[in-house]
A protein has these predicted regions:
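N-terminal capping/lid subdomain adjacent to the active-site entrance of alpha/beta enzymes
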Residues: 2-185, 192-195, 203-206, 230
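Catalytic core of soluble alpha/beta enzymes
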Residues: 162, 167-269
Length: 269
């Protein structure tokens, strides 16, 4: 498939309320949209890093710049028969998975249009429907959080993810479980704790959470494995896993029971 043209757009989206997590407070997010054109067909994609480099080293304006200056020129005017070939053409750029995903996912969308298939069919879809969860950040009061959780459940969401941080963890979960004792709840720590705070997570076993996501720093596998051996609640790795080999190491070390897979975070050098 010949790539005739790529158009890139950087869009800033404002939230109704700032999104508060262990990383801080974000007033909105950034989206890098890519439009890839081949003949009379086109494919669109979206990669959404945060406005600043706090979740990862990438951020909105930076990902847009890398995609525009280094990645798009590497593929425009060339023919690719697979995503593997496309990624090989971008391999001179190290890392930057969000920027690369904007280009690659546009290619997948375009390839689906050209072949007349759904994207799900191309990716080997096994289900037509999946359960959707909702998520809430840090608030000024437990009552406000509990009210929002109730709204999510009333709307039919099957699970709810809660952001946590120092001062908004065990007591917060006590308050939530006093109102929602049996609902599927899990938490996301956004790398805000250390191995010296294992006792905090031992206290969380009584809440029967579905999982605890990314308690330790984003490059760590070893300390997550030590924590997992001392608690009953499954861990989930997010920022730590960017490539397949890291997932393999995490599995071998018993570092987690789940992996949060964000397509824009994953890449292969």
């Amino acid at each position: 498939m010949h790539i005739d043209r790529i158009e890139l757009y950087l869009v800033e989206n404002r939230f109704h309320k700032p999104w508060r997590t262990a990383y801080g407070s974000d007033p909105g997010n950034c989206a890098v949209f890519a439009r890839m054109i081949s003949g009379d067909k086109e494919g669109w994609s979206e990669a959404s890093p945060l406005p600043g480099p706090n979740y990862s080293c990438e951020y909105g304006a930076g990902a847009f710049d890398v995609a525009k200056r280094f990645l798009a020129p590497s593929v425009i005017g060339r023919d690719f028969s697979s995503a593997k070939e496309l990624n090989a053409a971008m391999s001179h750029v190290k890392g930057n998975p969000f920027a690369k995903s904007a280009i690659e996912m546009a290619w997948w969308c375009l390839d689906a249009y050209v072949k007349g298939k759904s994207l799900g069919a191309l990716l080997g879809r096994e289900k037509d429907e999946v359960d959707v969860g909702d998520g809430w950040g840090v608030y000024d009061s437990y009552d406000e959080l509990i009210e929002n959780i109730g709204k999510s459940l009333d709307m039919g969401y099957k699970r709810v993810k809660l952001k946590t941080m120092h001062g908004w963890d065990v007591e917060m979960l006590e308050a939530v479980r006093s109102v929602f004792p049996n609902e599927t709840i899990h938490i996301d720590c956004n790398s805000s704790y250390t191995i010296d705070e294992i006792d905090i997570f031992k206290k969380m076993d009584k809440f029967h959470l579905a999982m605890i996501e990314q308690p330790f720093q984003n490059l760590d596998i070893y300390y997550h494995s030590k924590l997992q051996k001392q608690i009953e609640t499954p861990l989930c790795l997010d920022e730590t896993i960017t490539e397949v080999w890291q997932a393999e190491q995490a599995a071998e070390l018993g570092a987690c029971g789940f992996i949060n897979i964000k397509p824009a975070r994953m890449y292969k050098e």
